[in-house]
Amino acid sequence: MPLVAHTDLPTFQRLREEGQDVLSVERAARQDIREMHIGLLNMMPDAALEATERQFFRLVGGANPIVQFHMHPFTIEGLPRGDQAAEHIARYYESFDRIREEGLDGLIVSGANVTQPHLQQEAFWQPLTEVFDWARSNVTSILCSCLATHALFQYSYGVERTHLGFKRWGVYSHRVVEPLHPLVADINTRFDVPHSRYNEIFREDMEAAGLRVLVESEEAGVHLAVSPDLFRVIYFQAHPEYDTVSLLKEYKREILRYFSGEREDYPPFPEHYFSLEVGAALNDYGQALRSARRAGRAPPPFPEEFVLRHLDNTWRDTAKAVFNNWLGKIYQITDQDRRKPFMAHIDPDNPLGLA
């Protein structure tokens, strides 16, 4: 929670300059604690639908312990669904019409699987742009994850993402490059984040559009950037929401694709994710799997218990800190009426007073 500058002590101004939340007495007096309403547009495929709910709910729930958060999951048309996922959505999700009617303070937009060479050719593109159009006028801040970042960037600025020609896959070291921005204030200046993508928006493309890059990796590129107003849209290219085992599940899925003949090459390891001990065990497993494939035998059992004992999570605490900063800023500037994005005195084009 922010400090209140109830005296002229110079330390308050010094902390403001360092990016610390410090409210004036007048602004603090206008803050009535109420619950916050956060939407989750979940576009992930059936197998990851509920895991994605847990991942983002966990990050929101791990934020400020004083404020209560109401989560509002919903989805859109144009995404293929099996019977079980469709039933889950029908039972537990809200409609976009209801979301629009009742309003949100913040909106998280997940990634999605794609089947077309260009995002605008996807069946979900038009429904997704309708959500974007509404949210940009009615929600205090939108937080986009990976594919959603690429989609909103293209929709807003007309610039398509670039295919890398390979999969950026693993856990990469990142550095905060704008330490005074409130989103990254008081977090670790170096930290890891998982990436899992074939496409990228490069720093030069973001800066040409007026975005401000806050966190990047020498090896993996930009992770975190913000819209020109510095808060209305938060762009993630990586996956800070990932569980410790998320990349392991992806790796196992690729192994099964290789064994079934869906891919020709044996999958490489996610970079900087497995320890040397795990790598050695998985190399042995890979040899056994190849032998079984050549001989037409069933695949050997995966050494999951051993692998799980040696996996580390080097990103969760920083992810929680960033989400806490994001939600805290929303709370300070959103209107008491959740259908209105800002308090009356807040400039929508410069909501943090920093642009």
Curated annotation (Swiss-Prot):
Similarity comment: Belongs to the MetA family.
Organism whose genome encodes this protein: Methylococcus capsulatus (strain ATCC 33009 / NCIMB 11132 / Bath)
Protein name from the UniProt record: Homoserine O-succinyltransferase
What top-level branch of life does the organism fall under?
A: Bacteria
Under CDD domains, the record lists: GATase1_HTS (cd03131)
Give the residues the record marks as binding substrate: K167, S196, R253
As recorded in Swiss-Prot or TrEMBL, the protein's gene is named metAS
Q: What is its main location?
A: cytoplasm
The record's subcellular location field reads:
Cytoplasm
Fetch the SUPFAM superfamilies from UniProt.
Class I glutamine amidotransferase-like
First-tier enzyme category under EC: transferase
Record flagged with keyword Transferase: yes
Any Gene Ontology CC annotation? cytoplasm
**Which Enzyme Commission numbers does its entry carry?**
2.3.1.46
Q: Which reaction does it catalyse?
A: L-homoserine + succinyl-CoA = O-succinyl-L-homoserine + CoA
| Gene3D superfamilies reported in the protein's UniProt record | 3.40.50.880
Q: Where is this site: Important for substrate specificity?
A: S196
Q: Where is this site: Important for acyl-CoA specificity?
A: N113, L147
